[in-house]
Amino acid sequence: MHTLFPEIQPYATHHLPVAAPHVLYVEECGNPDGLPVLFLHGGPGAGFQPWNRRFFDPERYRIVLFDQRGAGKSTPHAHLEGNTTQALVSDIEAVRCLLGIDRWVVFG
């Protein structure tokens, strides 16, 4: 049986405006110089959980998590207008550009 890595806290958080009225909550954990990995939570509605930070070795990976439109700490909460697959892809690209990441592993 595999176990998760130890609990960690984010070293940076961001609030990223995307298509109005949505603002995404984004956080970074682990090694700022590590291999970038993006965690995608299920949805709509749930958001990521703190234990989701623990899937990857924080010494090796730059772990990026964000709450999708209407979920978790993103605002407005439970607002699903404009929550489409194409919008999600656009939001993921906006997060990647915000953080200056060229390529990353996508998990979720």
Language-model segments: what does each one mean?
Residues H2-V23, E28:
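N-terminal cap/lid segment of alpha/beta-hydrolase-fold proteins
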Residues T13, C29, L38, I92-R96:
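A generic structural signal for ordered secondary structure
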Residues A20, N83-Q86:
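Conserved phosphate-coordination/catalytic loops
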Residues Q86-W104:
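Conserved acidic catalytic loop of the alpha/beta-hydrolase fold
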